[in-house]
């Protein structure tokens, strides 16, 4: 801010490096570890690998104060009153939240007990303060308190004030006021002795995400996992849902399917509903354990109350196998070092215990469609992952990773690296890439004044959000989505076989390849049969009509 510009790439990488030097000041006196770390940082500068994008965003004071901010995403069941306040805390810190509103989870929530009195509650001007406001309201309606909070927002800094620790601008108190109003409305509709439904829990979390989105830290990424027979959740994005319940746009929804118990007729019935919906909703989440979940993009297999730990390999410009193995080696170095960040606060102790238990890695590859990587050559790299992870973990006195390899959608990383996204083909030879931006941000005002053709209002929140449209031309020789859906799915299956499964050590589910399938009108039956036959080769899948269906302001749009 003092220089009135944004950080340069080298400055961002240096900030990340300095954070690690502080965190591991004793451990990095080991020459072997320091040499590996410095070589890994050099690879980040060259954009051959990337650490966690949240680590790059918040490296320094923000992560030093709250180590959960180093992690992109997490997962929890909604089975406690603390689920709601923890969601606010995590989302405000930039961490995406996967959550389960399956019947057996929400049934553990207390019955509604409406408060009879009020008392003043001063909301602190901090992430913890906003989360505490959610906690106080939920507690007052669930028998933990006999008084309802009368919120005083006078301590919250005004809209537009600079945020020192994490960067960005303060949203002011209004988004929190609106959020609390909507949550109280849901709670007030209930009668004493009733419990929240899955859809009501989901809506509460989506209203929380709306407040976070207005804060401009990061788009509040969420995925809701719901029971197979939950018709309310299945249909909550049907029709013109965005007119009356625009908050539901804050989360992707996926139906939980036990791959060992589902019958073909049940799956085909669900498939027909997805086909008719034409919106990419709901997605499919195949699992071996109904309590396990995933992150919003579904590439990481997570126990309840566990964080993702991501890093990335740029697969678009790999020269040969030796080059690939070097990138794998140094991505493993950084990922293992990131796994040591477990000094959490505000969250329940179970978060630290579970995250330390598996010390997960999520080593992904992006730009796969830019380089036509041969998956048969990937298996040798897993020996390097295991050796380096064990070496670094022993030096840091943490556990070795239970699961190590994934392919994430790589929305941000692919933009940084100039590659295709994860496993996906490029959208087309020429297309628009869209992203959301707050209207209070300096970049919005600049583009709106100088390049207004790049800007349009966000249909969900036109008063505060906008869409930026970037025209993209892809590299020659790249795979585009003109390939058939089955060709794409076969690539998913091969990378699952040769990249994901060899990286699995323990756990009910393996990691996953985050995949959105675009289906042409004549491909629906073939895709249905492929998924059914290969349901052991995927955890999370999203299905979208080739023409975009009813997806409003989709992230990729054709240009002619």
Regions of interest found by a model, annotated:
Residues 1-560:
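Extended catalytic cores of very large enzyme megasubunits
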């Amino acid at each position: 801010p003092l220089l009135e510009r944004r950080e340069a790439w080298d400055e961002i990488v240096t900030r990340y490096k300095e954070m690690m030097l502080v965190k591991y000041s004793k451990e990095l006196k080991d020459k072997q570890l320091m040499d590996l770390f410095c070589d890994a940082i050099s690879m980040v500068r060259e954009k051959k690998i990337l650490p966690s994008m949240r680590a790059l965003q918040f490296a320094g004071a923000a992560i030093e104060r709250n180590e959960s901010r180093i992690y992109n995403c997490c997962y929890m069941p909604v089975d406690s009153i603390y689920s709601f306040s923890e969601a606010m805390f995590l989302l405000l810190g930039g961490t995406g939240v996967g959550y389960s509103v399956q019947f057996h989870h929400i049934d553990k929530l207390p019955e509604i007990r409406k408060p009879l009195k009020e008392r003043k509650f001063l909301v602190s001007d901090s992430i913890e303060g906003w989360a505490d406001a959610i906690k106080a309201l939920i507690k007052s309606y669930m028998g933990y308190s006999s008084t309802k909070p009368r919120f005083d927002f006078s301590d919250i800094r005004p809209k537009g004030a600079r945020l020192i620790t994490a960067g960005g601008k303060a949203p002011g108190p209004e988004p929190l006021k609106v959020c609390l109003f909507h949550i109280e409305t849901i709670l007030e509709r209930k009668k004493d002795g009733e419990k929240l439904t899955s859809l009501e829990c989901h809506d509460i979390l989506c209203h929380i995400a709306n407040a976070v989105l207005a804060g401009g830290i990061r788009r509040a990424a969420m995925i809701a996992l719901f029971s197979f027979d939950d018709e309310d959740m299945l249909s909550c994005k049907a029709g013109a849902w965005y007119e009356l319940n625009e908050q539901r746009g804050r989360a992707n929804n996926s139906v939980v399917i036990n791959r060992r118990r589902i019958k073909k007729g049940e799956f085909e019935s669900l498939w027909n509903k997805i086909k008719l919906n034409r919106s990419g909703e709901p997605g499919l989440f195949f699992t071996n354990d109904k309590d396990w979940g995933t992150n919003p993009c579904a590439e990481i297999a997570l126990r309840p109350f566990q964080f993702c730990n991501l890093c990335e390999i740029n697969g678009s410009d790999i020269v040969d196998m030796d080059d690939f193995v070097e990138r794998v080696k140094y991505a493993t170095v950084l990922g293992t070092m990131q796994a040591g960040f477990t000094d959490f606060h505000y969250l329940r102790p179970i978060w630290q215990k579970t995250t330390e238990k598996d010390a997960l890695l999520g080593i992904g590859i992006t730009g796969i469609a830019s380089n036509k990587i041969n998956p048969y050559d990937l298996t040798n790299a897993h020996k390097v992952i295991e050796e380096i992870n064990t070496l670094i973990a022993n030096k840091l006195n943490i556990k070795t990773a239970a699961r190590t390899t994934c392919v994430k959608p790589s929305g941000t990383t692919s933009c940084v690296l100039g590659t295709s996204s994860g496993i996906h083909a490029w959208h087309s030879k020429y297309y628009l890439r869209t992203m959301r931006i707050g209207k209070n941000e300096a970049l919005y005002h600049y583009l709106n004044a100088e390049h207004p053709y790049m800007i349009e209002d966000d249909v969900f929140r036109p008063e505060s959000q906008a869409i930026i449209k970037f025209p993209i031309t892809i590299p020659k020789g790249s795979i585009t989505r003109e390939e058939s859906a089955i060709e794409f799915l076969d690539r998913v299956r091969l990378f699952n076989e040769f990249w994901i499964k060899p990286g699995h050590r323990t756990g009910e589910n393996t990691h996953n390849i985050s995949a959105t399938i675009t289906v042409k009108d004549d491909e629906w039956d073939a895709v249905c049969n492929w998924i059914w036959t290969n349901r052991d080769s995927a955890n999370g899948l999203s299905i979208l009509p080739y023409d975009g269906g009813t997806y409003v302001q989709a992230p990729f749009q054709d240009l002619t």
